[in-house]
Amino acid sequence: MSESSTGAGLGPGIVVIDKPSGMTSHDVVARCRRIFCTRRVGHAGTLDPMATGVLVLGVDRATKILGLLAGASKEYVATIRLGQTTSTEDAEGELLQCVSARHVTDEAIATAIGRLRGDIKQVPSAVSAIKVDGRRAYRLVREGHVVELQARPVRIDRFEVLAVRPGPEVGLADVIDLDVEVECSSGTYIRALARDLGDAFGVGGHLTSLRRTRVGRFELDQAWSLEDLAELPRLSRTLDETCLLMFPRRDLTVSEVEATSNGRPISSAGIDGIYAASDADGRVIALLRDEGPRTKSVVVLHPVFVRVSIGRGIVGVIEA
């Protein structure tokens, strides 16, 4: 099938991609814009080129909720190498230092990882997309600047060691590879966990592999490859299905639908946090939150449409 003509007519929704290694998240978005025949495609959280796994994309109006998806918790499987420091804190960077990790015991690893669980302050990786004086940190690093980022609060709900192995390559007998599984809040840098774990032993550390297995309610077993989508373009979930999966539901009356679709507040529902306000057909009109006795629109997904005359008796319908 041609990528230039197969994606029309699917409507707004979410697509879960299994990102291959070597592609940037923007590369994946660009490919899916061709597959779905629309410029309105975005992603809900960057994966580094080296990393693979779950990348959640929004198509058409579903791009409006990507910011909410980006804040969801995430899960990863990764391999951390103790005994080597690189310029990027992962396998793509320049090797800066090698220090024997032979003395690091399993018990010491368990203790150090325990200190990285829970609510912690993490200094993000300098090679990140965080902006410093209006410029991305990774660009400054590549230009030779020293970038110092402030520690940020993150939460590590789970950080487990799956396996401990000696380095497999010739000449790397003094390094240790840890296969780990991490469940964490949005904004956590797994590279920074590798760095901090290596620093705890004074031997340095970096990531040699990273695979994201979950973003919020979207898991790896729901993901498609780009080749699958090029052959048969499809959505993982429609926009309405996604909203009803992620948020509590509030059913609206006819008058509430009219008000909500115009962005006007209605009476509060007594629901904590963001909720999906839907009509009788299950169409999610908007995402709302309560503010006192009234609601506040987080995002209007089905705005009101009005009929307008465009001349010679022709009537058109436009989004107000």
UniProtKB/Swiss-Prot annotation:
Catalytic center residues: 48
Transmembrane segments: none
Top class in the EC scheme: isomerase
Domain of life: Bacteria
Reactions performed catalytically: uridine(55) in tRNA = pseudouridine(55) in tRNA
EC number(s) given by UniProt: 5.4.99.25
Keywords of this entry: Isomerase, tRNA processing
Annotated GO MF terms: RNA binding; tRNA pseudouridine(55) synthase activity
Pfam families on file: TruB_C, TruB_C_2, TruB_N
Any Gene Ontology biological process: tRNA pseudouridine synthesis
Record-stated family: Belongs to the pseudouridine synthase TruB family. Type 1 subfamily.
NCBIfam families the UniProt entry points to: TruB
Function: Responsible for synthesis of pseudouridine from uracil-55 in the psi GC loop of transfer RNAs.
UniProt name for this protein: tRNA pseudouridine synthase B
Record organism: Mycobacterium leprae (strain TN)
